Amino acid sequence: RFFLLALAGIQFTHILDFMIMMPLGPEFIKELNISTHQFGLLLSSYTFAAAIAGIFATYYVDRFERRQLLLSLYACFIVATLACGLAPNYEMLFIARAFAGAFGGILGSLVQTIVADSIPFERRGKALGTVMAAFSVSTVAGVPLGLFLANHIPALGWRAPFVFIALISTLILYLGYRNIPKISGHLDHVHEGSRFNQIFKIVTAPQHLRAFIFMAFIMITGFSVIPYIALYLTTNVGIHVSYISLIYLCGGIATLMSSRFIGHMADKYGKVRVFRVLAIISLVPLLVTTNLPVTPLWIVLINSTTFFVLVSGRMIPAMALVSQVVDNKIRGTFMSLVGSVQMLASGIASVVA
């Protein structure tokens, strides 16, 4: 129980570190005197750095014991996040975000690798649902609390959420140190040939290519919309900025309640079937979100909550499927590449959108 809780905590903080930027968009634009395009670049600095770091990680991720690597990277992530809160200007914040993305991106794929290494496929959907509920918790508690701190600690302003994330991450680092066991089964396998040839074989395997393309399209469809929800609702739909926390809160609570249920359904009825259903249904709130005129708050809440549940829900059966197409001995490398594809796709979507 504490094993999955520690992994979920790591996921929670690095997802929150990424997500907190989105609802703070209007404040960043105002306080740093930047354009919407520059804000998009600030978001993409995290994702592109995560993508590049994930590619570099393929060279070493399967050559270290999982626990030691996870905790070391998490400590570096904490330092980078604190640097975001201490950044004096846009340029330094841009650099700090890139470092946070580099460490955070590897953490995400490494956590999923550890779950896949430790939990049998038959129960993996529910386990991933537990860990990926971190996304929900970050929206339920993290994002509203981050916005509250930013609005009610004038001395820190937008810096407050990053300081908060660094502090809570330090506690989770200790929890992980005490409860995550040593995971070294993958080190028993002999890696033949040069590391480059191994990675090339992983990248070019047909089933792996299909998985990369699959994950890229999932991320593009979500992150062409998600980063700009707060800006779109306040600018085009007429929602007051004070209600943004409520929108994320409702979406997060609903996603938290649905994550384990979706994981259970994926284990019971099949990952492919559940993914197809969620993918088709999610098109409705996706299209509504991008075409909303000035609309009453209650309608916005219904649509945005449905959007969060379905768009994030797709990832649970999707990740369970993707984690199964690769052997245990190269899973860390493969999942790092999957993480890089996810971050690269979301970064491109953020810039193009």
Regions from the language model: what does each represent?
Residues 21-22, 208-249:
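Extracytoplasmic gate region of multi-pass secondary transporters
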Residues 33, 65, 86-92, 238, ...:
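Helix-breaking motifs and short loop linkers at transmembrane-helix boundaries and internal kinks
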Residues 52-88:
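Conserved MFS/SLC helix-loop-helix module at the cytosolic interface between two early adjacent transmembrane helices
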Residues 96-134:
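Cytoplasmic helix-loop-helix junction between adjacent transmembrane helices
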Residues 130-178:
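Helix-loop-helix hairpin linking two adjacent transmembrane segments in secondary transporters
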Residues 181-212:
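Juxtamembrane intracellular "pre-TM" segments in multi-pass secondary transporters
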Residues 272-317:
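C-terminal transmembrane helical hairpin of 12-TM major facilitator-type secondary transporters
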Residues 329-353:
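A late C-terminal transmembrane helix in Major Facilitator Superfamily
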